[in-house]
Structure formats: C-alpha cells, structure tokens
Amino acid sequence: MNTEKPGGPFYQLSVDETLTSTNSTPDGISSAEATARLQQYGENALPQKAGKPAWLRFLAHFNDVLIYVLLAAALLTAVMGHWVDTLVILGVAVINALIGHIQESNAEKSLQSIRNMLSSEAVVVRQGNHETIPTTALVPGDIVVIRAGDRIPADLRVIEAHNLRVEEAILTGESTVVEKSTEALSGELPLGDRTNLLFSGTTVSSGGGKGLVVATGGDTELGHINQMMADIEKHRTPLLVQMDKLGKAIFIIILVMMAALFVFSLLFRDMPVSELMLSLISLAVASVPEGLPAIISIILSLGVQTMARQKAIIRKLPTVETLGAMTVICSDKTGTLTMNEMTVKAVITADKVYRVEGDSYEPVGNIHPIDEPDPITVAPGTLLERYLRTIDLCNDSQLIKDESGLWKITGGPTEGALKVLAAKVTLSPASTELRSKIPFDSQYKYMSTLYRIGNEETILITGAPDVLFRLCQHQQTDHGLEPLDQPYWEAKIEEYAREGLRMVAAAWKPAADGQTELTHQDLQHGVILLGIAGMMDPPRPEAITAIGDCLQAGIRVKMITGDHPQTAMSIGKMLGIGNAGNAITGRELEVMDDTQLSEAAQKFDIFARTSPEDKFRLVQALQSRKEVVGMTGDGVNDAPALKQADVGIAMGIKGTEVTKEAADMVLTDDNFATIASAVREGRRVYDNLKKTILFIMPTNLAQGLLIIIALLAGNLIPLTPVLILWMNMATSATLSFGLAFEAGEKNIMRRPPRDPKLHVMDGFAIWRVIFVGSMIAVSAFVLEAWLQPRGYSPEFIRTVLLQTLVTAQWFYMLNCRVADGFSLSKGLLANRGIWIVSGVLLVLQLLIIYAPFMQMLFGTEALPFRYWVITFIIGFVMFLIVEIEKPLTRKWRTA
C-alpha cells in the first residue's frame, strides 16, 4: 500500500501531519481540487488487464505438436482427394480443441471478484459540505464519513473515531474485530497492528468516524493483492508437463519413421506415390494417441463428480491429478483450522477454576470445576451465577438462530463469546431494566452498564483484566468479599495465555439508590472483581483428524496466520501439527533473503503475524524446494497464495468470492477433513489415469507396427486412417472409462506422495507398451498373412484386423485394472463400469461391421461368426500371457 511519506508511513503520522502531507484540511478538499486529483491519480478502481477473446483462446488449443501431425495428415488427404479421411481427421482435432476450450471456460474471475468488493458510493466532506459520490471519484485527500455497516471504499487514515470497530479478517486473518483510533503509532508494524488505518474492502462492525483517503485504486492494500493475482503465472501440473514431453517424443519418432520409410519405399518398393503417402498418413494417425487428451479430461471429470459428492468442488480439472502429488498444505488458521467462532473455554473466580464445554456459538456445553469430572448446576445467588448474569447483561451482542438452524452472533466476537457462555446455563428469573451505559472504547478498554435487577441498582463492568485490576480493591467469593489477590489473578492469566486464551474480566459494584446515570467517575472506587473468562477460536475437531490423516499420507501441514505467535503455537499443538513448539513471525520473514526463507519454510510449521506477501513468498519458497504445495484459506489475504499454490483450497461457506475464484478447489462444508478425502480421490484418479495410459499406448504401437511391417513387406495397407481413428477415438475411449471406475488400492493413504519428477512412462511402462504392442501387432500380422492368400477382399481383411485389435484391447483392459494379482478377481464384478463399457463396445462393433452406412463410411464388410471366435481366442491368449508377465516384472515397477 502506498503509505510511505517523507515523514514516515501514514500510521506513524499524527492527524495534522497526515492532513498536511495530503494537502487536505478538516473540511476536506474543494470540488475543483478533487477533479484535478482525479486526473492525477486516476479513478479509485482496480486496474484491469485486457483478456484474450474467446476465438483466440480456442485457437490456442491447436498449438500442440500432435495436433500439428493431424492437421498435416488432413491437408495431405485433402490434396489426395480422400475427403472422408480429411473430415474425420479434422473433426478429431476440433473435438480435442473444444474439450480444452470448455475446460478453460471457468477461467480467471478472481480479479473481477476483488473489484466487486469495492463499495459503490461514499459520503465525503468537501469544503465542509457532505456529499454522496461514486467511490470511483474518491481521491487522496478526500475525507470519508464512516458508519456502522459500511464497506471501506479506499485506504483511509482515521482522523475521527467513535467506538469504531472494523472486521478485517478477510484481509489480515484476525478473527477479532479491530478497535480503531486516531493516535499515531511508532515502529514498523504489520497490517493487523495498524490501528489508525482503514483498509479498502473491510467492513465497519460498529461505531463511526471519519477517515482521510491516503491511497486509492491500485495503490491500496486490496490493489496490491489484485496486482499480485494478476502477475501470478499458474503452474502446469506434473501430468500435463509429462503429456507435453510424451507428445514431443512421439512427434520426433513419427518424423524419423516417416522419413525412413519414405526413402525405403522409393528405393526398394515399386509403390505408387499416392499409396505410399496414404500409408505414411495412416502411420502418422496410428502413432498419435488422439483420444488420450479427451480420455484424460473425462476421467478427471469423473473424479470431479466424485469429489463434489464428498463436498469438494474442483474448479480446474488438472487439480484432481495434482492432489495425489501434494506434499505440503499451508493452511490459514482462522475459519479453516479453527471455527472462527470465539468460544469461552475457562472461567476463573477467586474460589475455583472452571472448564467450559463447547466449540461454537451453539449455546450447548456443560461447566465443570477444573478438577472434577461431573458438571455443575449453577445455583441462584452463587458467585458463578452473579458472574454469568454480569457478562450477559453487560454486553452489546446478540445470539440468534438463523433460518438454516445455525447459531450466529451480532456484534463483536469477544462479547459474543460471553453471551454464548451465559446462554449455556439457565439463570434464575429476574426483572432487569437498563438505566445507563458506557460503551466499550479502546481508549479505556472496558464497558459498563447500570441495571436495575429486581429491586436493586447494580453497576456491571467487563473489560481488559489489567484495567479492571486498577479499578478493583476487592474480589467476590461465595462467602463474601476479600481483598483483591492480584498475584493469584496474574498467575492464572499467564497460565492460560500460554494455552492461547484471551482473557476478559468481569466486575460489579452496588449503585446508589435511584441512580439513573453512569459516568467513568462511578467506577473509580468500590468495584468488586467477579472473575475472568479465557476464550479462544477453537480448533475444528474434524481438522485434528484430517491433519493426522495427512501426516499418515506423507503430507506436512503448516499453519500460516495473522495471529500472535503464542496463540498460533497453542492452536498448533491442539491440532497435532508437527513442529508446533516453534513459531516464526512475518517480521522475521521480511528481512530474510530467498535462501534463508527457503530454509525457514522447511524448518517451521507455525508462521504468525504474517501478511499476504509473507504467505505468497512462503508458498514460492516451498515450491523452490520442489514441494507440491496446497494452500487453504477463506480471506482475500489468502487469494494470491492460493493462486500461486499448486492446489489452492478455498472455504465455501465462510470464504470470500475472491478466494473461491482464485482457488482450484472449494470445500462446500468448510471442513478441513474434506481435504483428506480429496487427496484419497486424487490418488485413486491418478492411479487410474496411469492404468489408462498404459492401456492406450500399446494399441497405438501395434497399429504403427502393422503399417511399418506392411510397408517393409510390400503388403496391403492393413488399416486406413478412418479405421485407426475409430479405434483411437471410439473403442479406446469407450474401454478407458471402465478403468476410470476402479476402486482405490487399500494402502492408498498410507504411502508417501508420488514424486512429480517420476514420469508416467517409466521403465516398466515402456517395457509393457513394447511387450503388449508387439504381441498385438505380431498376432494381427500373422492373421493378415493367413487371410491374404485365400482371396479375401482388402475390406474384409481390414475388418478382421480391426476386430482382432479391438478384442485384444478389451482383454488388455482387464489386464490393466489390477497392477498386481489376477485381474478376474471379485473386484471385477464390483466395477459396473467395466460391464457397461463392454456392452457399449459390442454395440459399436456390431454397427461398424454390419450397418450398411457404417460399412460405406469406414470401408468394412460383414464377418461370419467364426471370425469373432478366432479373434476372441487370440485376445484371450494374450490376456493369459500378460497375467503371467505381471509377477515376473513386479520388482521393476514403481509405486
């Protein structure tokens, strides 16, 4: 944010100094000056980058080496007049581009979501007059009138504050509202401690005042985040990178083979050029796994549907694959690992210490003496009842149940926590009447009310313990009054502060008969301390389990928060985060160079008092160490880091629209445990993708080998381009879906994340492709050699070869469904997808072999039943051979 001035940042300047530095006055600037500054600084709007038009994004999907092969093949077939081949090949290329374009249709809306956070109108003071203007017309030097419920329209320096409290959790991650004041601050302070600044996009919780505009548009803190989002280039997932490399390797192999065969055929075979070119086009089409991109997308989409049923919405398809490789989750604390609902966990009185059950705003939970297992019933007239009535009445918040049955509070979270505590017990009936009130203010750090309770006037007080200690001379017990034992209270405060609890004290004093007004002077004597509440934003119980699951799966969890280090470490220990006994702050991170930051990112698991830049840099530092990073969060402050992360995970209920749009995955139940389920599903999907790739590639190799053998031997072209495309786009794609429904392995969440550097086509995969592809090709070639001397037509022979390859594919799909063990196991019956795709495949083959219009289009002929039997036997023999190969090659395989 543009808060630096020659005299120091704006938060270090007094109100007068700030007015001087912005050339403004308490009455604001003139309309003429505002117009001039609008020309100088521009509109109070976030900069926008021009997006690519849809047609250009569509054409970009043709920028792929394998698509180049198809386009070249289409061009050559068109020149040769083979229009059916041309149209089919072009259709395949267009379908692949369309699938990629549709995937991209959820493209970046993050920046627009940030812009939507800006309010539309603001009340300003110009030349002493109040005016309502569009927020886009705000300029530095304007004075903005602030009221409860307003969304802050620009970055402001507070120049007037009346009990002003602001909700900044979306920006800083702090779960408590921030008290704002006009006083100048000293030292270098993180965002959350700049209590005299108001930030664009945050919301006024209560109170009001005025603020001087010190930054607009792209110069605001929100603008800074907007720029970070715009500058981030999203990483490609490991699988996509590997597919690119595989495509380029196939492209080079195709060029070399085509060149070699072209020269060989010209020199040693008397083959017409047109026939030779058609053979080479068939070879090119056969070598390209045209259906693979579409199949990968569809399998990922099926994984997306499964995750959606498990309450994880995947916004970007490749995220499904990346989840399986994730090694680190960087999680925001507030609202993600914790409830974002401040809850009282302990009550300290002069007589006893109590623990309080419950972890949310729902008013359910017993109160136990700290050393007793059984809960107590709060009796009328006891110290505890007086304490609970005090925190209930000296309170501006309300506890309500919304239409969906969720409990919520209005007002600040600290008062809300006290209100919930009081609602957990049934207080004895008493008539109450509020006579007077001193609202809470950060200047004096307490709130006080004057009530008539029954027939007595009573003054009730809640506030910071150190302030109430100065007001109190006595403490209340169940047996009467005692002198204040301040060392006892300070020891208890220190004890519970180490556990991350924030402390709020409560006190009372009798009021004078007939008193109707309350002043600060009334609180300077005779105040009696009742007790202290220790409260915290508690961990989500399900998050504790989820973190354990992640650790078991080899995924390290790191907590990144805007809270204080002691609070962060306490929460970290409760959650079971690995190195929760040590924390490092954003201030320490800021002075580190990249090398030091990289080491700190690996060493620490708790990062406190962090800014958006810190979170962003931490993700980058972990990625520099080759970690695959997931980042969870719900506030705007998390959005840049979410976008930078390999997997950005947003909260669906409490998350802002900005965060959701920046994320790759949105949890609809805000449940950290859903991440563990998503990781499990991501690993299952990747396993099935690898099985699918291993299934498809041997068929392409077999097709290519058949054509190469035919050219070398001077035989008939065994497969035309359209038949090859039928196998690659129809039968291969259909059968691949059967593998997509395979269940996950039993040890899927007990093995470490896979290494992204390991190629899906590892040594074993290459062996399997060559072994199976060669076996299929040799079988088909032998069958072709047997058929040719018997006078069958080329169309008949090609139809037999097509059925042979398709049947071999079907049996090999059964081989691929189980990496180890026999494929015809019980799981085969459980996977209904196998049988559905088998039925679809049968229908497709019947159509292409026996339907007249398909025969005309693809050049096939009807087959007698005995050829179905022959091809079935060939396929079954190959199935048995691969099953025998599995145990022999087990030691070569990678996990």
Question: Where are the predicted features?
Answer:
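Generic alpha-helical transmembrane segments
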Residues: 731, 776-777, 799-813
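Conserved cytosolic headpiece of P-type ATPases
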Residues: 1-750, 760-761, 774, 785, ...
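Membrane-water interface at loop-to-transmembrane-helix junctions
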Residues: 755-774, 794-800
